[in-house]
């Protein structure tokens, strides 16, 4: 069994902001000022979910309600479901307009547009229980960095010309004709986790060394801060290791590794672990998953920076 230090530290990179959109909408992201210098967009996920459309031939309207029928495509199978809404428009003279491929629709009356929506975001605006919306969940295909620290503020706009994103996005569309391909832009914030072992009998030398080390590591993590680019690097690597996306190659089997200079500060500080945490059910109203990770509203995983033979996990019960 590996050793444990009297005081152990871990860095938890917690999902702070996430925006989902399609590639053609990247040009509009900066208009919303959703990402800023305090919560910049450094990482992006390329994801897929079933293709969602509306059946314009099954639209119904009465004084009491409007009925819309949506279609979920799963490979070569098509499932329909109906949603009814109270008619608050004080008229039955409402038309549904949707051109092929029926992923966008309008509700109009006398030339006035009442609703103008893309099907997927429209359905995503409803509580999950209301529409049984597991078809809105996102399968992670690729994870990458938007840009380095210097380009953080303009990253969403500059992603329009990001060659790696464009190439993988296009390949995903070709390989998944029954699916919609979505981008999830993400910002992560650091949470420092500290554990002090009051049960293990340490030697005086170990305790003295810990008294010297503890404030240095604490100050570095909480005040001076780890290099921002290194945080982006190990967050990306940890997410790739966790989700094992189809289109990622590096980090799948090689994280963590002390030979990687791109996050060497973690080893210099001799911290115990790095963690990733994503709570997407409330933020974007869907779950994330991959071939190796099941659907869940919340994902958290820790990665020990050393083998268990060298170092005991701070998350194990003492």
What are these regions, as identified by a protein language model?
Residues 1-318:
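Boundary/linker segments flanking structured domains
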């Amino acid at each position: 069994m590996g050793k444990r230090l009297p005081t152990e530290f871990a860095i938890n990179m917690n999902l702070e902001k996430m925006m989902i959109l399609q590639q053609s909408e990247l040009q509009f992201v900066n208009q919303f000022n959703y990402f800023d210098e305090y919560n910049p967009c450094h990482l992006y996920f390329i994801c897929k979910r079933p293709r969602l459309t509306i059946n314009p031939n099954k639209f119904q309207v009465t004084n009491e309600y409007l009925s819309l029928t949506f279609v979920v495509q799963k490979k070569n199978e098509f499932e329909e479901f109906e949603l009814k809404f109270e008619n608050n428009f004080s008229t039955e003279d409402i038309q549904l307009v949707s051109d092929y491929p029926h992923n966008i629709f309008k509700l109009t009356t006398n030339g006035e547009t009442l609703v103008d929506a893309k099907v997927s975001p429209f359905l995503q605006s409803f509580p999950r229980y209301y529409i049984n919306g597991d078809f809105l969940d996102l399968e992670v295909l690729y994870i990458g960095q938007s840009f380095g620290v210097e380009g953080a503020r303009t990253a969403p706009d500059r992603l329009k010309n990001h060659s790696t994103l464009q190439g993988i996005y296009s390949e995903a569309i070709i390989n998944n004709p029954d699916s919609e391909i979505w981008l999830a832009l993400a910002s992560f914030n650091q949470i420092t986790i500290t554990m002090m072992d009051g049960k293990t009998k340490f030697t005086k030398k170990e305790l003295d060394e810990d008294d010297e080390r503890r404030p240095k590591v604490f100050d570095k993590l909480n005040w001076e801060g780890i290099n921002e680019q290194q945080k982006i690097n190990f967050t990306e690597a940890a997410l790739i290791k966790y989700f094992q996306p189809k289109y990622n190659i590096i980090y799948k089997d090689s994280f963590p590794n002390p030979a990687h200079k791109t996050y060497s500060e973690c080893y210099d500080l001799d911290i115990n672990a790095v963690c990733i945490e994503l709570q997407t059910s409330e933020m974007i109203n869907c779950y994330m998953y991959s071939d190796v990770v099941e659907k869940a509203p919340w994902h958290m995983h820790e990665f020990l920076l050393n083998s268990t033979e060298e170092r005991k996990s701070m998350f194990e019960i003492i």
